[in-house]
Curated annotation (Swiss-Prot):
Keywords: Acyltransferase, Cytoplasm, Fatty acid biosynthesis, Fatty acid metabolism, Lipid biosynthesis, Lipid metabolism, Multifunctional enzyme, Transferase. It comes from Clostridium perfringens (strain 13 / Type A). The keyword Lipid metabolism applies. Pathway: Lipid metabolism; fatty acid biosynthesis. The last Arg residue of the ACP-binding site is essential for the weak association between ACP/AcpP and FabH. This is Beta-ketoacyl-[acyl-carrier-protein] synthase III. Homodimer. SUPFAM superfamilies: Thiolase-like (SSF53901). Catalyzes the condensation reaction of fatty acid synthesis by the addition to an acyl acceptor of two carbons from malonyl-ACP. Catalyzes the first condensation reaction which initiates fatty acid synthesis and may therefore play a role in governing the total rate of fatty acid production. Possesses both acetoacetyl-ACP synthase and acetyl transacylase activities. Its substrate specificity determines the biosynthesis of branched-chain and/or straight-chain of fatty acids. Its main location: cytoplasm. InterPro entries: ACP_syn_III_C (IPR013747), ACP_syn_III_N (IPR013751), FabH (IPR004655), Thiolase-like (IPR016039). It is an enzyme of class 2 (transferase).
Length: 324
């Protein structure tokens, strides 16, 4: 049976690097306060590049590594909560900028779990024969959704993009399994407000502040629970031992969350790939950025089994087992 194999990887960040110390210039915070509570030391903040721009640059690298032209791509999925516009979709903008004229393109919004959701869709479409070469992208410019006066949230996030090319294969490799779940009843724990209902037929006009609003305590409890459960579930479902897993790539939200899960599972800390100290929380881009960086640095190789695990607004969560 056909499967979807990863054959190209690319990441991209804006040029504007913001160390923790720069945040002290306008926030009541410090490098020590941020590092001890989150593990974050720096992040990239876009000055003039939108989500599609970051996605395009990451995609160019992935296509180059895959040795495919843009015209050979027949599917583009962008996972993002910070699109350029409501419409056209960021994926359609990426399609145009790349010259991928044979691809159909759309966005999905599953917040920080978005890349895992996108992998599930890409894999399913390739297995069904609806696509042959798919470009799967996680890209965010979260800086435009931040309240830069709220030190509890604005210090956490960064901008960036990661992309991978999936292709159809008969080989015993690729995306082995993807489990995703949702719980909309707890969606108010992490919100970026949309436009309010605001018509001339309604009494009074509403004003919306489209900032990230997060209940940190609730998200911590949720994240640690579902990350642990997702890892255990996918190991049991695929009948694979943790010793056979080369690496686990978690959503890069907070070092405390990752360390808590490591302790709960009793898995060696070195199996967990973390790079949030350099990028912050890039939402749907965090897992592909960590994946691509690990590939680039030679920390992952062909034949390795890896688990990606994420959680995010919605609430959403999920995990994927992949043989590179």
């Amino acid at each position: 049976m056909k499967n979807a194999k990863m054959i190209g990887f690319g990441l991209y960040t804006p040029k504007n690097l913001v160390e923790n110390e720069r945040l002290q210039e306008f926030l009541e915070t410090s490098d020590e306060w941020i590092r001890t509570r989150t593990g974050i030391e720096r992040r990239y903040i876009s000055l003039d590049e939108n989500t599609s721009d970051l996605a395009v640059e990451a995609s160019k690298k992935a296509l180059s590594q895959a040795r495919l032209s843009a015209e050979e791509i027949d599917l583009i999925i962008v996972a993002t909560v910070t699109p350029d516009n409501f419409t056209p979709s960021t994926a359609c903008i990426v399609q145009d900028k790349l010259g991928a004229k044979n691809a159909w393109a759309f966005d999905i919004n599953a917040a920080c779990t978005g890349f895992i959701y996108a992998l599930k869709l890409g894999r399913s479409l390739i297995r069904s024969g609806e696509a042959n070469n798919a470009l799967i992208i996680g890209a965010e410019t979260l800086s435009k959704a931040l309240n830069w006066e709220d030190r509890g949230s604005c210090v956490l996030f960064g901008d960036g993009a990661g992309a991978t090319v999936l292709t159809s294969t008969e080989e015993d490799c690729g995306i082995k399994c993807v489990n995703v779940k949702s719980d909309g009843s707890k969606g108010d724990s992490l919100v970026i407000q949309g436009l309010p209902l605001n018509s001339p037929f309604k009494d009074g006009r509403e004003v919306s502040e489209n900032y990230i609003n997060m209940n940190g305590r609730e998200i911590f409890k949720f994240a640690t629970k579902v990350m642990e459960e997702s890892i255990v579930e996918i190991l049991e479902k695929e009948n694979i031992k943790i010793e056979d897993i080369a690496a686990i790539i978690p959503h890069q939200a907070n070092l405390r969350i990752i360390d808590y899960v490591v302790k709960r599972l009793g898995i060696p800390r070195e199996k967990f790939i973390t790079n949030l100290q350099n990028y912050g929380n890039t939402s749907g881009a965090s897992i592909p950025i960590a994946l691509c960086e690990s590939i680039d640095e030679g920390n992952l190789k062909k034949g390795d089994n890896i688990i990606m695990v994420g959680f995010g607004g919605g609430l959403t969560w999920g995990a994927a087992l992949i043989k590179l």
